[in-house]
């Protein structure tokens, strides 16, 4: 570093620099208790000392011999002109003889006082006042902070960033500035700043600020020499200026953590650095620290994220960064493994020799389980033949022609990396002459009440068995309700006919069906076992929507109040599966326009929360299904979204919200809500329409009866939503149903009714392969259903069912999904408003 180049251009700070090595005149060693009159003599001797100290060589003596320099300076030859000139002393010798200056500051010795006077270009003399001695070194923390800001400001003016330098973060710019300042101060380039080097840095008067409070660069050693070795390293210099050096190994940029559902896990942030600021954790861009989540917290001092009980909703991406350093981010991908959960069908069956028999096993888990079959404990894969085969990735065991020796207990075993599950399907082979009681019960009683479609039409309730393709039972409008002896559909005075009006219906554990009769302000309870209407429950006027909360055994009832929907209400029927003795509870929610209760599945068997929508409020309201109390409001106002429908997938915990259309002919956009944080993530890409989620939570199909597009998305094992494809469908979709694939054990297919055409749409979700089933009759005509719902309903037949049912104008059509073909038409049934499938009882 050049003497007289950088340092003389800086200003003197409030307190004196510590005593450092330099030129010292004789007067500097004098006692501060100087008597009056000694100042002039002292100044004369100072000239003489300066002249002698400026004669290091004979050549210089000739040039500076007649050049007199004042205190605090010495004679030097100008390198350009060769002429002698007086320049301020660079440093003073390290001798501590404190002296008060006439400027009110305390100096380490007389040399430093005179050097400061030289640098500042003003007269400063020693005084005998004790004030500055009593004040001592008054560098406060506030002044020290101000000093560091002044040093950085001066450095930025001295060495500005070159033009064209890319704009960087403030933290990065500050780091470069501090590095530059350290390099300039490190005169000997040894990577350590000593007291001598810091003492050379003085500030000019115009750069001084009263708020510095007597602080000097030497105070860097006093405050930030952490190892007390008398020097500052670059690391200590970084710390002094609060420049944090953080690092993240390239291999840690993305960290994948796999944990089994139900366990706890800890995500540790791999960002390292001395004095690292607090770690901030985010999920889907939302900070987790202040949300008060019951199952996630980051209170650990090590900056880790703790998830106390992992479920599939927790899967997805989590990020961590140090506070104020958002440019350095680590991503944690949380994958959740789920042990297999299986169901077999049928649990027991009896067949006669020579007929075909199938045993089916459905398994869900993450990763996808592998299925094997045992017969009486022996692996059947070693017995494969033309008569015995495994279909759909082993999920179906098919016997082409059964024999007596095929009788046995067939065990389905599903395995994946984290667990195993098994169940037994029993097969009995007996001829008709040797029927056992169990055989008779299975064949006759079982088929008489279970595995049926219950159709609610204008002329009553029709029970249809899909295998026989015939009506098993018909409950006419004049049938009596068992407990009240009222008619199912009483005749209105003056009407010649007695049509039934139905709205919504739900299956309650394959025991009862609850169905709404809006015009009669009641809900009927149908006993599946007896195939009779058991009772009626009076509810608020115009009940139009029912939903069964299986987790709490409750049926929720939404009523309009009147045809203008001006007095809507939400009621709950408790203990629904008992069939009688239920209680009707009125909820406290006003202005309800719609509600949503997520369905259960094999993996998620308990639901805690539901959601309600208000007529004029751009928000969804989270409700505790057990206490029936509102918990939280999730505002959609920022997106101008009035919610119309919702769907949910447990994979990643996403809610899909359909917003109302802007115009009668447009389709409503969708928003995504994260169920972990109850926060809106934003639009679901450019997806529009009503969302439908497959039973396993993997596929999301969005359709509309007004728009031409069908969108298919998939949730990956990492909890990420990706769009698979978009299909253009004309006209729009009326209703949609899912059916388990009969060729791929882990896949689902979708069927959809068209709003204005008789065809039935078929879609293989994983591949996008699409087809149409034709030869169906015209769909129901006329205006949209009075009580809401699709114009042309479509109902599947459960997890193992292969049939679907949809109405035409005056008939019903049954479709065999396994063969992807029309099964039959059941004529003479008009105005089918809703359909319920009842599985095995």
Curated annotation (Swiss-Prot):
Annotated region described as Disordered, given as residue ranges: 29-54
Gene: Fstl4
Lineage, broadest ranks: Eukaryota, Metazoa, Chordata, Craniata, Vertebrata
Sites where a glycan is attached: 317
Residues that hold Ca(2+) 2 according to the record: 225, 227, 229, 231, 236
MF annotations from Gene Ontology: brain-derived neurotrophic factor binding; calcium ion binding
Record: residues binding Ca(2+) 1: 186, 188, 190, 192, 197
Annotated GO biological process: negative regulation of brain-derived neurotrophic factor receptor signaling pathway; negative regulation of collateral sprouting; negative regulation of dendritic spine development; regulation of collateral sprouting
All copies of domain Ig-like, residue ranges: 250-336, 340-425
Leader peptide range in chain numbering: 1-22
Protein's UniProt name: Follistatin-related protein 4
PANTHER family, A to Z: FOLLISTATIN-RELATED, FOLLISTATIN-RELATED PROTEIN 4
Main localisation: secreted
Basic and acidic residues compositional bias, start-end: 42-54
Pfam families named among the record's database cross-references: Ig_3 (PF13927), Kazal_2 (PF07648)
GO cellular component annotations of the record: extracellular region; secretory granule
